[in-house]
């Protein structure tokens, strides 16, 4: 049986009509040098700054140095399988992270991938990790309080929503504890928290996650972690990933608290990358743009106006000092970028004053306008009194014949120090802080022995909860101080039942 020529030609025509010429064009370069998490590639002439590049083994990289003949790439993953001569391909995408509600309650790495073993995260949106900060006209001045639940902070260095408040101090002085207590205190405050751990031990991060879970705070918290064992590029990217997640919520009109723990390690990781990329070193071998690294990150924290639904990001960056030296390079940089700093001192910490906040060196440049009226009234002079007490205390060590006024100031100062002490993971609601600070500043604690102050406080606040809730409710609802008569009546009544130690 013969095949007709027409049939053959119609079959060929049919095949030609169905043929789709799919030609995939991608720009490919060649790795010419590799080592220490950095690759140098030739041939990617049109690569963009910060573009994602894909190596032949599937590992991603990020274009950092764009030079005439080659591109310096930081590798975002294991680099041991990449060799000279391997292909590296442009993706045309800028580095992005997944964002959205689905991340809440999860622990992720700086690329947004889950590391808590609880399955994949099905997000639908992503945001670029680098985006310009909002301009002047999109912002609003800080005016709403962010209650940390820590008496020493809410009274002396108040923080407002949209503020950047640096927490600075040596290692092991309770910086992380301040942040965790602040996160725990946001329960019921309609606040989303993001904790970014940079270069921490994995065991430490695990401890933080367990603390948050135990107190139910993981229900409104995202943990972003780049552990000490991970490559430097991930440590450098972690804060940017965290703030991109925060911006998504801010643009929906929500309030976000983001903690960077800590930026000294991010600066070290960036220094490592820059030196490996052969960028010229500056002071303390940091690259020239290390200030810009932190300023562009922290400027993304803002309080937005009505046009952007009044959302806010409040940032608590940490910086670790060496032997209390706050005049080093990174500390002075971040102090000049932020709206104030809380200085934690190891001497105070070791002498049992915890949180170890140095009232003299700590300052909040914009938080005063966000403080509630009740707190303003009771804590107005507290800062100055405490600073004066520290001065008098060192002076009083040398002389015994002090006049009555000086002695009274010293006694009041000792009680102030006791009242500002606080246990770990026990944040205090603002109405209770106001009650105990009222008792202190109005002289109601002057006849209580110093060693009984802590016990007096806990018993008095429990007693108020049961017997005089009107005082607490008034502050909670109106943000104003309850009438003096109510406080005096409550204190007088309670003091009759309080047993002083001998």
UniProtKB/Swiss-Prot annotation:
Highest taxon above the source species: Bacteria
Protein family (similarity comment): Belongs to the ATPase alpha/beta chains family.
Upper lineage: Bacteria, Bacillati, Bacillota, Bacilli, Bacillales
Ligand binding (ATP): 169-176
PROSITE patterns cross-referenced by the UniProt entry: ATPASE_ALPHA_BETA (PS00152)
MF annotations from Gene Ontology: ADP binding; ATP binding; proton-transporting ATP synthase activity, rotational mechanism
Database matches in InterPro entries: ATP_synth_asu-like_sf (IPR023366), ATP_synth_asu_C (IPR000793), ATP_synth_asu_C_sf (IPR038376), ATP_synth_F1_a_nt-bd_dom (IPR033732), ATP_synth_F1_asu (IPR005294), ATPase_a/bsu_AS (IPR020003), ATPase_F1/V1/A1_a/bsu_N (IPR004100), ATPase_F1/V1/A1_a/bsu_N_sf (IPR036121)
Coiled-coil region: none
Localization terms from the record: Cell membrane
Site residues (Required for activity), renumbered to this chain: 362
Species per Swiss-Prot/TrEMBL record: Lysinibacillus sphaericus (strain C3-41)
Function, in words: Produces ATP from ADP in the presence of a proton gradient across the membrane. The alpha chain is a regulatory subunit.
Main location group: membrane
Enzyme class: translocase
Name of the featured protein: ATP synthase subunit alpha
Keyword presence, Transport: yes
GO CC annotation terms, alphabetical: plasma membrane; proton-transporting ATP synthase complex
Subunit description: F-type ATPases have 2 components, CF(1) - the catalytic core - and CF(0) - the membrane proton channel. CF(1) has five subunits: alpha(3), beta(3), gamma(1), delta(1), epsilon(1). CF(0) has three main subunits: a(1), b(2) and c(9-12). The alpha and beta chains form an alternating ring which encloses part of the gamma chain. CF(1) is attached to CF(0) by a central stalk formed by the gamma and epsilon chains, while a peripheral stalk is formed by the delta and b chains.
Catalysis: reaction(s): ATP + H2O + 4 H(+)(in) = ADP + phosphate + 5 H(+)(out)
HAMAP family: ATP_synth_alpha_bact
SUPFAM superfamilies, alphabetized: C-terminal domain of alpha and beta subunits of F1 ATP synthase, N-terminal domain of alpha and beta subunits of F1 ATP synthase, P-loop containing nucleoside triphosphate hydrolases
